[in-house]
Structures are given as C-alpha cells and as structure tokens.
C-alpha cells in the first residue's frame, strides 16, 4: 500500500514540540515501512534543512527556524526538498509581492522511504499569491 501523511509541525515554539512530533512521525513511517508499505510524508517542518542556504530576505527581528536533525533519520528514510526557491515567507506584515521587507524560508518538503524513487522535486514559485507558502511537488516511482 501507499501511505501518504500530510503534516504541519509546531511553529514558533522552543523546538521541543517539533522534535517530539518528528519522532512520532518517523515512528509511524517505520511501522508502515516494516509492513512493506511505501511511505511519503509531506508538509511544513517549521525547520530549515542543513544543506539549505539562507534563501533570501532579512531575518533580522523575525522568526528564525531551527535546523531539522536529518542525521537522526533511519538510513531508509530520505529527506527531500527543493533547495533553489523559498517555500515560505514571513507573516509579520501584509505581503504585496515586494520581497525586500520579508524573510524567506525553506521549511517545506517530504520524508520518503527508500522503496519510493524520487524522480523530481520542485517548489513552485507562485510568489505567495494564495498563502504564506509556495507549493512543493514531487514526482515519484514506487519500487
């Protein structure tokens, strides 16, 4: 079976909530993988990723995300994201499309078990027209 999980980890906390939620998510993925299932979990980590550079805008005086602990994942679960475009913008003021007064983050992506082959991942730059997040898409093959 294909198991899809949509998640939104805790925001604006000291990090403990996200750590606990991530552990719970990984335990769910491990249990489903042991059953022989394909598992894809996608959503808002509210954490950035170690290899993702500061993606733009000024973070001064704004929320700063923690870093996702990718090294704590089991070897058969991969972290997948598009490191070329921001997936989220700051919410401290209305967004009019002018990027100079906002902070931008890369905090959205996927966790996938190794029986799911990644073909493509892309953050679609909609300039935050509909949300404070841009959509992130994946194309995969179940192996």
What are these regions (language model features)?
Residues 14-17, 127-132:
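Solvent-exposed loop/turn segments connecting transmembrane beta-strands
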Residues 1-6, 116, 140-143:
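Beta-strand-turn-beta hairpins that frame and shape the catalytic cleft
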Residues 14-115:
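Metal-dependent phosphoesterases centered on the DNase I-like endonuclease/exonuclease/phosphatase
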Residues 5, 103-107, 132-136:
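Residues that flank catalytic or metal-binding motifs in active/ligand-binding sites
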Residues 110-112, 137-141:
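Short, well-ordered beta-strand micro-motif
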Residues 7-9, 43-45, 134:
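Active-site metal-binding loops of divalent metal-dependent hydrolases
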Residues 116-127:
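Low-complexity, intrinsically disordered Gly/Pro/Thr-rich segments
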